[in-house]
Amino acid sequence: VLPLAGFKKIQPRVYSGFYPVDSNDYQESKKALDKLSLNDNSFTYEPESSQSLGHGFRCGFLGLLHMEIIRERVQREYNLEFLMTVPSVTYRIEDKKGQTLDIRKPSDLPDDNSLKCYYEPIALISIVTPSQYLGSVIELCTSKRGAQQDLIYRSNMVEIRYEIPLSEIIYDFFDTLKSASKGYASYDYDIIDYRESKMLRLDIHVNKKKVDALSQILHKDCLLYTSDAADDTPC
Protein backbone atom coordinates (compact mmCIF):
# COMPACT_ATOMS: atom_id res chain seq x y z
CA VAL A 1 0.00 0.00 0.00
CA LEU A 2 1.44 3.35 -1.06
CA PRO A 3 0.72 6.55 0.87
CA LEU A 4 -1.34 9.25 -0.83
CA ALA A 5 0.72 11.82 -2.69
CA GLY A 6 1.33 14.85 -0.54
CA PHE A 7 0.52 13.03 2.71
CA LYS A 8 2.84 14.04 5.53
CA LYS A 9 2.85 12.48 8.97
CA ILE A 10 2.09 14.99 11.71
CA GLN A 11 5.14 15.54 13.90
CA PRO A 12 4.77 16.17 17.66
CA ARG A 13 5.79 19.63 18.85
CA VAL A 14 5.81 19.06 22.62
CA TYR A 15 7.26 16.20 24.65
CA SER A 16 6.69 15.11 28.24
CA GLY A 17 7.59 12.12 30.36
CA PHE A 18 4.65 10.00 31.56
CA TYR A 19 5.48 7.80 34.56
CA PRO A 20 2.88 5.46 36.12
CA VAL A 21 2.11 6.45 39.72
CA ASP A 22 1.99 2.73 40.51
CA SER A 23 5.04 1.04 38.98
CA ASN A 24 3.02 -2.19 38.73
CA ASP A 25 0.86 -0.48 36.08
CA TYR A 26 3.71 -0.18 33.57
CA GLN A 27 2.55 -2.93 31.20
CA GLU A 28 -1.08 -1.81 31.37
CA SER A 29 0.07 1.75 30.69
CA LYS A 30 2.01 0.60 27.64
CA LYS A 31 -1.07 -1.17 26.27
CA ALA A 32 -3.23 1.91 26.89
CA LEU A 33 -0.80 4.29 25.15
CA ASP A 34 -0.46 1.85 22.27
CA LYS A 35 -4.23 1.83 21.71
CA LEU A 36 -4.40 5.62 21.86
CA SER A 37 -1.57 5.99 19.34
CA LEU A 38 -3.43 3.73 16.89
CA ASN A 39 -6.39 6.13 16.61
CA ASP A 40 -4.40 9.36 17.01
CA ASN A 41 -1.42 9.48 14.66
CA SER A 42 -0.27 12.81 16.09
CA PHE A 43 0.41 11.14 19.46
CA THR A 44 3.66 9.21 19.85
CA TYR A 45 5.36 7.42 22.72
CA GLU A 46 8.47 5.41 23.44
CA PRO A 47 9.75 3.74 26.63
CA GLU A 48 12.20 5.66 28.81
CA SER A 49 13.54 5.37 32.33
CA SER A 50 14.48 7.80 35.06
CA GLN A 51 16.72 7.24 38.05
CA SER A 52 14.20 9.05 40.24
CA LEU A 53 10.84 8.00 38.72
CA GLY A 54 11.62 4.54 37.36
CA HIS A 55 10.21 3.22 34.07
CA GLY A 56 7.91 5.40 32.00
CA PHE A 57 7.33 6.82 28.54
CA ARG A 58 8.49 9.81 26.51
CA CYS A 59 5.28 11.04 24.86
CA GLY A 60 4.92 13.48 21.96
CA PHE A 61 1.95 15.84 21.46
CA LEU A 62 0.80 18.67 19.21
CA GLY A 63 0.60 20.99 22.21
CA LEU A 64 -0.37 21.28 25.86
CA LEU A 65 -4.10 20.88 25.17
CA HIS A 66 -3.42 17.68 23.25
CA MET A 67 -1.26 16.45 26.15
CA GLU A 68 -4.04 17.14 28.65
CA ILE A 69 -6.60 15.34 26.46
CA ILE A 70 -4.39 12.23 26.30
CA ARG A 71 -3.84 12.30 30.07
CA GLU A 72 -7.59 12.59 30.73
CA ARG A 73 -8.40 9.79 28.28
CA VAL A 74 -5.92 7.42 29.90
CA GLN A 75 -7.35 8.23 33.32
CA ARG A 76 -11.00 7.98 32.25
CA GLU A 77 -10.83 5.01 29.86
CA TYR A 78 -8.13 2.91 31.55
CA ASN A 79 -8.17 4.16 35.16
CA LEU A 80 -4.42 4.89 35.09
CA GLU A 81 -2.60 7.76 36.79
CA PHE A 82 0.68 9.30 35.60
CA LEU A 83 3.31 11.64 36.95
CA MET A 84 4.13 14.09 34.14
CA THR A 85 7.44 15.88 33.65
CA VAL A 86 7.75 19.51 32.52
CA PRO A 87 6.82 19.74 28.80
CA SER A 88 9.70 20.44 26.41
CA VAL A 89 10.24 21.09 22.72
CA THR A 90 12.83 19.40 20.51
CA TYR A 91 16.13 21.25 20.61
CA ARG A 92 19.03 20.70 18.23
CA ILE A 93 22.69 20.70 19.19
CA GLU A 94 25.96 20.65 17.28
CA ASP A 95 29.04 19.18 18.91
CA LYS A 96 32.63 20.19 18.33
CA LYS A 97 32.98 17.41 15.75
CA GLY A 98 30.27 19.02 13.60
CA GLN A 99 27.65 16.36 14.32
CA THR A 100 24.03 17.40 14.97
CA LEU A 101 21.62 15.74 17.37
CA ASP A 102 17.97 16.36 18.26
CA ILE A 103 17.27 16.53 22.01
CA ARG A 104 13.76 15.66 23.19
CA LYS A 105 14.45 15.52 26.92
CA PRO A 106 16.87 17.58 29.02
CA SER A 107 18.62 14.57 30.56
CA ASP A 108 19.86 13.58 27.06
CA LEU A 109 21.83 16.81 26.75
CA PRO A 110 25.59 16.06 26.66
CA ASP A 111 28.18 17.86 28.74
CA ASP A 112 28.61 21.53 27.78
CA ASN A 113 32.31 20.96 27.12
CA SER A 114 31.47 18.80 24.10
CA LEU A 115 28.95 21.23 22.57
CA LYS A 116 29.52 23.94 19.98
CA CYS A 117 26.01 25.34 19.37
CA TYR A 118 22.43 25.11 20.60
CA TYR A 119 19.50 25.57 18.22
CA GLU A 120 15.86 26.07 19.18
CA PRO A 121 12.68 25.85 17.04
CA ILE A 122 11.22 29.18 15.94
CA ALA A 123 7.52 29.66 15.23
CA LEU A 124 5.85 32.27 13.03
CA ILE A 125 2.75 33.24 14.99
CA SER A 126 -0.16 35.23 13.58
CA ILE A 127 -2.38 36.99 16.13
CA VAL A 128 -5.70 38.69 15.38
CA THR A 129 -6.89 41.10 18.08
CA PRO A 130 -9.14 44.15 18.48
CA SER A 131 -7.01 47.26 17.95
CA GLN A 132 -7.54 48.55 21.51
CA TYR A 133 -5.55 45.59 22.87
CA LEU A 134 -2.67 45.88 20.41
CA GLY A 135 -0.29 47.44 22.94
CA SER A 136 -0.82 44.62 25.45
CA VAL A 137 -0.34 41.97 22.75
CA ILE A 138 2.90 43.58 21.53
CA GLU A 139 4.14 43.74 25.12
CA LEU A 140 3.38 40.03 25.56
CA CYS A 141 5.16 39.01 22.35
CA THR A 142 8.20 41.11 23.22
CA SER A 143 8.41 39.49 26.66
CA LYS A 144 8.47 36.10 24.91
CA ARG A 145 11.62 37.01 22.93
CA GLY A 146 9.52 37.77 19.86
CA ALA A 147 10.57 39.71 16.76
CA GLN A 148 7.78 41.58 14.94
CA GLN A 149 7.42 40.71 11.25
CA ASP A 150 4.21 42.38 10.10
CA LEU A 151 1.30 44.53 11.26
CA ILE A 152 -1.94 44.71 9.25
CA TYR A 153 -5.01 46.75 10.17
CA ARG A 154 -8.39 45.28 9.19
CA SER A 155 -11.23 47.64 10.17
CA ASN A 156 -11.28 47.55 13.99
CA MET A 157 -9.11 44.42 14.10
CA VAL A 158 -5.34 44.05 13.79
CA GLU A 159 -3.31 41.09 12.54
CA ILE A 160 0.20 41.05 13.93
CA ARG A 161 2.90 38.52 13.09
CA TYR A 162 5.87 37.63 15.24
CA GLU A 163 8.69 35.14 15.17
CA ILE A 164 8.82 33.61 18.65
CA PRO A 165 10.73 30.60 20.03
CA LEU A 166 8.37 27.63 20.27
CA SER A 167 9.35 27.05 23.90
CA GLU A 168 7.87 30.47 24.76
CA ILE A 169 4.50 29.53 23.25
CA ILE A 170 3.79 26.07 24.64
CA TYR A 171 3.41 27.01 28.31
CA ASP A 172 1.16 29.93 29.27
CA PHE A 173 1.04 31.93 26.04
CA PHE A 174 -2.61 31.16 25.26
CA ASP A 175 -3.88 32.07 28.74
CA THR A 176 -1.76 35.23 28.89
CA LEU A 177 -2.92 36.32 25.42
CA LYS A 178 -6.56 35.84 26.39
CA SER A 179 -5.99 37.88 29.53
CA ALA A 180 -4.22 40.67 27.62
CA SER A 181 -7.06 40.90 25.07
CA LYS A 182 -9.98 40.27 27.44
CA GLY A 183 -10.55 36.99 25.61
CA TYR A 184 -10.92 38.46 22.10
CA ALA A 185 -7.56 37.58 20.50
CA SER A 186 -6.91 34.40 18.54
CA TYR A 187 -3.70 33.00 17.11
CA ASP A 188 -2.17 30.35 14.89
CA TYR A 189 1.45 29.37 14.33
CA ASP A 190 3.81 27.21 12.29
CA ILE A 191 7.37 26.12 13.02
CA ILE A 192 9.57 27.75 10.39
CA ASP A 193 13.18 27.19 11.38
CA TYR A 194 15.82 26.20 13.93
CA ARG A 195 18.09 29.04 15.00
CA GLU A 196 21.17 29.30 17.16
CA SER A 197 20.39 30.37 20.70
CA LYS A 198 21.96 30.61 24.15
CA MET A 199 20.42 27.65 25.94
CA LEU A 200 21.44 26.01 29.20
CA ARG A 201 20.18 23.08 31.24
CA LEU A 202 18.68 23.73 34.66
CA ASP A 203 19.10 20.79 37.05
CA ILE A 204 17.06 20.45 40.23
CA HIS A 205 18.63 18.85 43.31
CA VAL A 206 16.69 17.38 46.22
CA ASN A 207 18.71 16.52 49.32
CA LYS A 208 21.85 17.23 47.28
CA LYS A 209 20.88 14.65 44.64
CA LYS A 210 19.97 15.61 41.08
CA VAL A 211 16.45 14.62 40.05
CA ASP A 212 16.82 13.98 36.32
CA ALA A 213 13.07 14.11 35.62
CA LEU A 214 12.93 17.73 36.85
CA SER A 215 15.68 19.06 34.56
CA GLN A 216 14.74 21.75 32.03
CA ILE A 217 16.40 23.40 29.03
CA LEU A 218 16.01 27.18 29.29
CA HIS A 219 17.24 30.28 27.53
CA LYS A 220 20.12 31.93 29.35
CA ASP A 221 18.03 35.00 30.27
CA CYS A 222 15.25 32.82 31.69
CA LEU A 223 17.78 30.78 33.65
CA LEU A 224 19.13 33.91 35.32
CA TYR A 225 15.58 34.90 36.29
CA THR A 226 14.89 31.40 37.63
CA SER A 227 18.10 31.47 39.64
CA ASP A 228 17.20 34.85 41.18
CA ALA A 229 13.75 33.57 42.11
CA ALA A 230 15.26 30.47 43.72
CA ASP A 231 17.68 32.61 45.73
CA ASP A 232 14.73 34.54 47.18
CA THR A 233 12.95 31.35 48.24
CA PRO A 234 13.64 30.26 51.83
CA CYS A 235 14.91 26.72 52.28
Residue ranges, per PLM feature:
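Structural and coupling elements of P-loop NTPases
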Residues: 1-227
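Single conserved hydrophobic/aromatic residue that forms the stacking wall/gate
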Residues: 225-235
